Amino acid sequence: MRGVWKSKVAIPFLASLVLESGAFSYSKANEAMQAHDAAGATRMHTTPGTPIYFQKLFQWMRLRLFGACLAATVILGIGAPTGWGQQAQEKSRDLELSRAVRPWEFLPVTGTRAVLLGNESGRMEAWVYPLKILREFHLKFRSEGRVLPAEALARTITVRPESSTILYAADTFTVRETFFVPVREQGALIILDVETEQPLEIEAAFHRDFQLEWPAALGATYLDWAAAQHAFYFGEEQKKFSALVGSPTAAEPRAEFQTNYSESQESSFRLGPTAKGKERKLIVIAGSMEGPAAAEKTYRHLTADYADLLKESTEYYRNFLAQTVTLDLPDEQIQRAYDWSRVSMLQGMVTNPFLGTGLVAGYRTSGVSQRPGFAWFFGRDSFWTSLALNAEGDFANSRAALEFISKFQREDGKIPHEISQGANFVDWFKGYPYPYASADATPLYIIAVNDYVVESGDAAFAKEKWQSLQKAYAFLKSTYDERGLPQNFGFGHGWVEGGPLLPVKTEFYQSGLGAEALRALSNLARVTGQEEISKTLEKDFEKQRSLVNASFWIADKKRFAFALDKNDKKLDEPSVLATVPMWFGLPSEAEAVPMIQQLADIDHETDWGMRIISNRSPLFSGGGYHYGSVWPLFTGWASVAEYRYHQTFPAYANLRANALLALDGSLGHVTEVLSGDYYQPLSTSSPHQIWSAAMVVSPILRGMLGLEVDAIHRSVKLAPHLPADWDRFSIENVRVGKNTLLFNYVKRDEGIVLETGLTSGSDECTVEFRPAISLKAKVQKVDLNGKPVPFQVETREGDQHIVVQFPVKTGKYILRIWLLNEFGYSNQPALPQLGSASRGLRVLSETWSASRDQLTLEVSGAAGSKYELEVWNAGLIQKVEGGELGRKPGWTTLWIHMPPSDSEPYPHARVVIHLWPKVPPG
């Protein structure tokens, strides 16, 4: 259970608590903080048993005291200094992840033009796009008359955005093998740092696998030793494709062979002996699509300049993280998962020398085939990922991904489903069934372009793509049936590509995307100055929205059908796919909330994410790719939808499940698909899936923090639904047109403080702050820089939102919201042990009494289990039915005991919390 950080430096709500006198200016506070930094005096106190996750605590404490002093100077009329909010330039997050080796886990090291794919035992394959060079690369250690396979000695794996290192340890030596792929080079390096007591020699071995990515092929290829380069040369008869694999110290080559009597696919070379002490060895892999001379040039460049290239790659990722939306969160696991997921998405950007630059879908080893997971270009993967890229402010890569896919739009307007990296070598678009297999890529294209334009403010892109967008809309309309619903049958699959859920005429998922595409196109027409077209499309959208909801809603069961069959009959198979229309807010709250509550139960939601259908369905199989498995993609859809409809407990559980997946499995990455029965990736899963990483970023930014930017209108909305035990966060580098903003949020017993201001730019923009509070809470007043400001309170079934709008230009803005009787509870779900079934708590619904003195929770959990919730403002609790209060340092806890049951392994229960009108004195 994660502890909640409590600063030794109190963050007061009122300025009078900050200052002993008005003379304590910002500059003195800053000097004090710098002295404090130098002394290294701050230490963190955690509750017993709490993991030490808060490695960045001091930076936050420095920021918070700085903010408190700044708030005081504003309130007291003291001039604030320039240069406020430059924390992003000062930070360099340490993203290194390390653990004991799991030999079976996937290990990717990526660049934009090359990639190494393997596992934590050190076995690798190498690609220089679109060319596969080798597989089964591994090391052998020769020491004291023995030959030791490296995988038997692999002890620790350490990953960083730019490289990964395996530590091998034996009795008398260690070797650190660092895999590194420069960002923009057609090659890779393996750096070996040796430390030994006895003479040691390393042998590098591999299987040549010199072929193009599927479905293309090179035909006859060969291997030879190039003595001048100390490397094996890979070639083919036309001498267009070539590669070199070697080392400056390579010697004693042994090449693959085949005779009538024996054969070996393995080639190897030795790196020269290390007598004793420390030494560095280097292995270089270079490829080219332009002949042997180009490959040799790259080989020499990598050999001579690898140290500079490693530094450049480190800076590349550091700069990317510093220039996109940066968070500082109280939960270090979610913090790291967010940053690593941003890196993972960036690692999906690939440059193919024949096709261009776009987003691939994911990575896995290809083995003896030429299919490296999904390391080629997909339409809908790119579009779902672009929504996360836009949210984090990575507009350049979002635009590049959209540009790439749109280049291959079919003449009738249909958007491609997938484009192999070998597509230019074959008749891909006419000779194969895959390029335009899906129907959902087309509406997603329109939606993704609109999202990019709104978030980035790039109206010129909308004008440039208008003809393409019109063609896409024309194709979408051509798929409508007589009622006006877009069809899958005969036009391309929706989400489900195969299995027992098919055939269907149209999915709710597909029809929802079709409706949202109309709204998106209406806005794009408005942005491009076509008001009449925009108004017509807006009316069409409202009609389509009503039609879609009515066509799939099953009123007596309070849920949406998965699909319609060929006779327009509703197929009552409740599915997480329904959360896609909810992501965009298409259903009403009266329709969405009851279905979300059904999806939150254990038959749909596992501890590691959302199943596609209930495990109680006769169609379910835990290993069914499209009929029972858990996809982080689904989990992200559900989380964003649940936050949109204020169902924060399942929303956070799903967000956290995806975040924790990023720190398990292939370190720093989120897998494609997992079993629906047990916490275990499917055996065919792509372990580094790009849109899975996107479904960490979108639920955090779009969901939990409610961050929405409209750069066209220079406005930003922040509508956080925070776990009750979160008392602060910071958001930096929020780009709104030419401006960037910073937000610092602090919650205390007295209320909420939001600090904001421009960190670059000078254009006025509008901030709308909409924090969620409980229905128990009462808003006393709101002020901005010490002056009262108008506000509204929007009340819903499950929470309230305080709504405050204010302009931001120059200067700093301190918004304070005074609250009474705020109340909340939280839970920190964890992943189970590998191979285990779900056992976590589910909060299915919350119901408040009209007088706000009673909160009823409907929950489900494993029979006989005990669950812990942490309570905010526990002094309000009068008594609890169905649970009991407890204490731990700094927190009151609510324990829920699920009843034992022989018949129902996951029973439901009810917890009723009775509350005082206000906290009793004493």
Regions found by a protein language model. Give the residues of each.
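C-terminal capping/lid segments that line or modulate ligand- or cofactor-binding pockets
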Residues: Q87-R135, F374-F378, T385, K430-E455, ...
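Bacterial N-terminal signal peptides
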Residues: S16, G67-G79
